[in-house]
């Protein structure tokens, strides 16, 4: 491992209605040691209470990916989109030349929990666009977001992919970061290899490694795996 980010060392923003943990520097949280990895700029782990959310705000030249873990997001944007994104679905918004949007907890009975990731695009000034989908798990590693939209994945303006990793108790996998940069963000459960144990919210970055073996604990393991351009 070239980069280890324990969950309890992440930055935090708490406004009462929002409890957000920042893997990398974001907003008022700044740490020069945690500015992102490769083209992955943001991983925010957000919890939003009932009836609350983010009012209309703007972005430009950023690929914004949202994966809902609990509850549902009500999304509305300046492109005319108004959708509900329930748990298990993933959303991609390319901000391009500029877009405004709002995100609120749609549920009246349960809190909202989601991950939001920002990836720097390889082309600036594109037309803003939006996609969302649900992709069923097909084996331990299932692709969610890619540069070419293969296998029903959302299409990203960058040479990068995001996979959902799900391992049953005791199941093992080898993650491949040869000639690339890999980043693993743990969602739930536990896993380990010979040198490190990880649990929910922990992150591991591989910038000079070829492969990484991982075995799930007794409670299984779920994570997102980012396949990113190599760090020069």
Short names for language-model regions:
Residues 1-232:
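Jelly-roll (double-stranded beta-helix
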């Amino acid at each position: 491992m070239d980069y280890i980010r324990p969950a309890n060392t992440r930055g935090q923003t708490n406004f009462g209605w929002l409890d957000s943990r920042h893997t990398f520097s974001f907003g008022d949280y700044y740490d020069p040691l945690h500015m992102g990895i490769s083209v992955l700029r943001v991983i925010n782990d957000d919890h939003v209470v009932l009836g609350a959310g983010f009012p209309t705000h703007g972005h430009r030249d950023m690929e914004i990916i949202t994966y809902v873990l609990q509850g549902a997001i009500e999304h509305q944007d300046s492109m005319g989109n108004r959708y509900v994104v329930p748990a298990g679905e993933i959303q991609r918004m390319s901000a391009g030349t500029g877009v405004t949007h709002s995100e609120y907890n749609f549920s009246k009975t349960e809190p909202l929990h989601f991950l939001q990731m920002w990836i720097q695009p390889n082309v600036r000034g594109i037309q803003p666009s939006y996609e969302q989908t649900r992709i069923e798990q097909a084996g331990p590693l299932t692709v969610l977001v890619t540069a070419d939209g293969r296998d029903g994945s959302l299409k990203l303006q960058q040479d990068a992919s995001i996979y959902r990793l799900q391992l049953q108790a005791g199941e093992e996998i080898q993650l491949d970061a040869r000639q690339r940069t890999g980043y693993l963000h743990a969602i739930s459960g536990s896993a380990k290899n010979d040198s490190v144990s990880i649990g929910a919210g922990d992150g591991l970055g591989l910038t000079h490694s070829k492969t990484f073996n991982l075995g799930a604990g007794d409670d299984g393991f779920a994570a997102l795996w980012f396949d990113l351009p190599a760090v020069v």
